[in-house]
Amino acid sequence: MPSLPQDGVIQGSSPVDLGTELPYQCTMKRKVRKKKKKGIITANVAGTKFEIVRLVIDEMGFMKTPDEDETSNLIWCDAAVQQEKITDLQNYQRINHFPGMGEICRKDFLARNMTKMIKSRPMDYTFVPRTWIFPSEYTQFQNYVKELKKKRKQKTFIVKPANGAMGHGISLIRNGDKVPSQDHLIVQEYIEKPFLMEGYKFDLRIYILVTSCDPLKIFLYHDGLVRMGTEKYIPPNESNLTQLYMHLTNYSVNKHNERFERNETEDKGSKRSIKWFTEFLQANQHDVTKFWSDISELVVKTLIVAEPHVLHAYRMCRPGQPPGSESVCFEVLGFDILLDRKLKPWLLEINRAPSFGTDQKIDYDVKRGVLLNALKLLNIRTSDKRKNLAKQKAEAQRRLYGQNPVRRLSPGSSDWEQQRHQLERRKEELKERLLQVRKQVSQEEHENRHMGNYRRIYPPEDKALLEKYEGLLAVAFQTFLSGRAASFQREMNNPLKKMREEDLLDLLEQCEIDDEKLMGKTGRVRGPKPLCCMPECAEVTKKQKYYGSSDSSYDSSSSSSNSELDENEKELCQKRLDQVPYSLKHTSHCKIIQQPSGSHNLIYSESPVYLTTLVFLSEFPDSMRRSVSCPRSISAHLPSRGDVRPFSSQQVIPLARPTSASRSHSLNRASSYARHLPHGSDTGSTNTLNESLRQLKTKEQEDDLTSQTLFVLKDMRIRFPGKSDAESELLIEDIMDNWKHYKTKVASYWLIKLDSVKQRKVLDIVKSSIRTVLPRIWRVPDAEELSLYRIFNRVFNRLLWSHGQGLWSCFCDSGSSWESIFSKSPEVVTPLQLQCCQRLVELCKQCLLVVYKYTTETRGPISGIGPDWGNSRYLLPGSTQFLMRSPLYNMKYNSPGMTRSNVLFTSRYGRL
C-alpha cells in the first residue's frame, strides 16, 4: 500500500505534475546581466554648517555620504583640518584646506611673515599697513609713537586680537600709551582716507581659489561682495573712535545696526556685488583694468609669502607623491581688501574659512557661483578612484618583484656602464617630465573650458610678470626656508621645468641616439630619415610605378614617353586608368604636367628625377574628396560640387616660365599618353582605383601648395631698417665673408646677452610673417590647422633649444643638426617640406645677423630689443622696423614679367 504523506512534504496536484522536484529538472532561472551603474562621485559634507555647500553638491550631481565615511572623493570642512588627515588621504580624494595656510590667515602670522618679506623686497610689498605684534614688538611701537610726538604728528591705530574673527575685540586708539603691553594683539596704522561710496566706508570680499601648491595655481573670482558701513564716514577723532558702525565694515558687526539696509538687488543696500562696483567705477571714469590688475598682484604676492610654508607642509604630509602630481588639497580663501581714496588696494586680512551664509539673495548668487565654478575647476572624475587603486597595485607589484626601470650601479662598474647608467637615468627623468607636461596641458585645457567667472592669475600669461613673480618666490624661499632654499631653488631652476613637449621629445631622441652610439649600433644615421619619395634612398613603390618616374635621367631630346615605362608597368597603369570615369579620362578634363626636378628644387634628390603628375580638374564625387593622406586643412577647403571652376580661373602661382622646348615636350608627352588610355573595362577592384585616385588628387594638391609655399619663402628677404634690399643683402654677405671676425661677437650676443624671451622675439620676426602668409596660400582661416606649420613650429623650437644652441649650431660647417628632429617622427616629412624648413632656417640665421648688426650700429640696448617690441612684433628701439620682404600674391595666374610689391606682414593686410 502506498504510504501516507507526512507533514511538511510538498505534494503535487497529480502524478505528472511538472511542479514536482525531479532529479533531472532545472529550476534555475536564466541570469539576466544587470547593467553596470555608472560611477558616482561622492562627497562628505558633515564638516560644514552652510546649506549652500550642500545645494551646490547636489547641483554637481555628487552623492552625499554618511558622516563617518572617510573614502569620499570630496571632503568639505569649515574649520582647518589636522595634517594627519591630509596624510591619510588617497590620491583620488580632495579636501578643501591646505596645511600651512594659517601662516597668512592668522593676523599675527600674516604680520610676522609680511614684515620679513618687506625687509627683503620693500618696493614690492607696499600694500600692507604698518603692523606691530604685541607683546613682542611693544617697545618698537612705543618708540614709533615717540617719534610721531617729536614731529608733532598724531595717527590713529586699530587694535585687533591676534587670532580674532568677525570683528570681535576690535577698537580704535589715538594714544599709544593706552595699549596693554602683555596682551596678544595686533596694532596697525589706520587708513584714515578711504575711498567712499555714497559717503560710506566699505571694503571688498574677494574670493580666491588655490587648486595646487606644487606647482602653485591661483584663480581669482571676478565677483564678490562690497560690504559697507552703516553710518556716514567721518575721519577719526576723539569723539567718534567708539562708533564702530562708521569705522568697521564687517557684516557681523553692521547687521546689528538698525540702519543696515537689506535689499534684494545688487545695486542698493549695505551689501552689494563687486560686479556692480566695477560698473560704478567705469561710469565714474576710473580705470577698471588697473583696478583688477592691482587686486591680482596683491593676491599673488600675498600667496607667494605663504607658498614656502604651504609647500613644505604639503610635502611633509604627502612624502611619496612626486612633484607635479595632482593635488589632494584645494582652498577657497576670502581676501578682505580696503581701497584708499586713490583706489590703491590695502590688505586687511585673509579668511581661510570665509562665511558661506546666505542671509540675502546677493549672498546666494555670489557664493553659489564661487562654489560651483570651483568644483568644476577641480575636475573630479568618477574614474579617479579606480585608476588610483590600479596604480597602487602596480606599484606594489613593482616593489615586490624589484622591477626598477633603472638598475642600480655596482661599485666596480666600468666607465661604459656608468655612461649607460647616466643615460638610463636621464631618459627616465625625461619620460617623467614628459608625462607631467602632458598632464598639465590636459589640465589647463580643462581649466580653460570650465573657468566660468574665475580667472587664472598665477601663473600669468605675461612672461615678464611671470619672471617677476618667480624672482619673488626665490626670495620667499630664501627668507622662510633658508635651510632648504637651495634644494627648492635647484628645483625651480631645473631647465626641464620650462620645456615643452616638443623639446622633451627632442632630448629623448638625442638620448636614444647617444645610447645607440654607446652600444655600437651604426645602422641609423643621425639626421632626417630616408623618405619614401627619394628614389635613390628607397624602393620604388607601386604608386610611384603607376604615377611616378623612372630612375633614368631626363633626356630633353626625347619626344616619346613610352621609353620611361616598361611594358608591364604600362599594362598595370592602363588597367588602373581604364576604370576611371569618362569625365576623368577625357582630354578636356585631364592634363599631364611634367616638371624636371632641377626646376626650383622640387625633388630632393642628387640625381635628376623626372616627375609626371596627373592633375584632374573635373568634379570628384563626395566620397573621393577626403583621403587618409590628406591634411584637414586641404580636404576642408576642396571645391564643392557647386564650386567647380574652369582651369582658366583656378588660382595658380607659376614657379617658372617654361622654355619653348619643354612646353612642346610636355604637349607631345600629354598627347602620347592620352593615346594609350584604354577605353574598355577591367575586372579589377573599383574601390582600389578610387582609393588610388583620392590619394593622388590630395597628394597632388598638397604638393602644389607646398611648392607655392617654398616659392614664397625663397622670395622672402630680411630688410635692415632704413636700407634697401640690396644693401641688406650686402650687409649679410659682408658678415659671412668676415665670419672669423664676427663669430665670437655674434655668439656672445645670441647666447649670452639675449635671454630666452628675447631670443624668441628675434625668431618671431620670421615666424609671424610665415604665420600670416600660410593661410593665404593654403586658403585656411588659421595656420595652426596646417601640418606644414606644425613642422615649422618644431623647427623653431629646435632652433631655440638649449638657450639658442639649436640656431647657433646652424652656423657651423654642417648646419643641419636640426634635421634630427625628423629622424624618429611618426609624421613623414616630404622633400618639399624639408626644403621649406631649410629655407626657414636660413631666414632665421639672416634675421639674427641683421638684428645683431642693427644693435651694434644704433647703440641700442644691450639686448637689441626694446621692452615694447613684443607688442608690435617687429618694432625695435625707436621708430625703425625690420621688414620681411615678400611678393604680394593675389593667388591668380600671373605672367612672370609682372612686378611684385614689398609688404610688411601686419594685421592691417586683410588679404594678399
From Swiss-Prot:
Residues binding ATP, per UniProt: 160, 166-167, 188-191, 201-203, 249-250
Region of interest (c-MTBD region), residue spans: 388-450
Source organism phylogeny: Eukaryota, Metazoa, Chordata, Craniata, Vertebrata
Ranges for domain TTL: 38-390
Annotated binding of Mg(2+) 1, by residue: 336, 349
A cellular component term, taken from the record's GO annotations: dendrite
Annotated positions binding L-glutamate: 227, 251-252, 271, 367
Family: Belongs to the tubulin--tyrosine ligase family.
UniProt domain comment: The enzyme uses its core to engage the disordered anionic tails of alpha- and beta-tubulin and the flexible c-MTBD (cationic microtubule binding domain) region to bind the microtubule and position itself for beta-tail modification. The c-MTBD region is positively charged and becomes ordered when bound to microtubules: it interacts with a negatively charged patch on alpha-tubulin. The presence of positive charges in the c-MTBD region is essential for proper binding.
Pfam families reported in the protein's UniProt record: TTL (PF03133)
The organism's place on the tree of life at top rank: Eukaryota
GO molecular function: alpha-tubulin binding; ATP binding; beta-tubulin binding; metal ion binding; protein-glutamic acid ligase activity, elongating; protein-glutamic acid ligase activity, initiating; tubulin-glutamic acid ligase activity
Protein name listed in UniProt: Tubulin polyglutamylase TTLL7
Entry's pH dependence statement: Optimum pH is 7.0.
Binding site for Mg(2+) 2: 349, 351
Region Disordered: start-end pairs: 547-570, 658-688
Reactions catalysed according to its record: L-glutamyl-[protein] + L-glutamate + ATP = gamma-L-glutamyl-L-glutamyl-[protein] + ADP + phosphate + H(+); (L-glutamyl)(n)-gamma-L-glutamyl-L-glutamyl-[protein] + L-glutamate + ATP = (L-glutamyl)(n+1)-gamma-L-glutamyl-L-glutamyl-[protein] + ADP + phosphate + H(+)
Gene: Ttll7
Single GO BP term: protein polyglutamylation
Ranges of biased composition (kind: Low complexity): 549-563
Keyword Metal-binding found: yes
Tissue expression per record: Highly expressed in brain, testis and trachea. Expressed in brain, heart, kidney, liver, lung, muscle and trachea. In the brain, highly expressed in hippocampus, thalamus, olfactory bulb and cerebellum cortex, corpus callosum and striatum.
Subcellular location per the Swiss-Prot or TrEMBL entry: Cell projection, Cilium; Cytoplasm, Cytoskeleton, Cilium basal body; Cell projection, Dendrite; Perikaryon
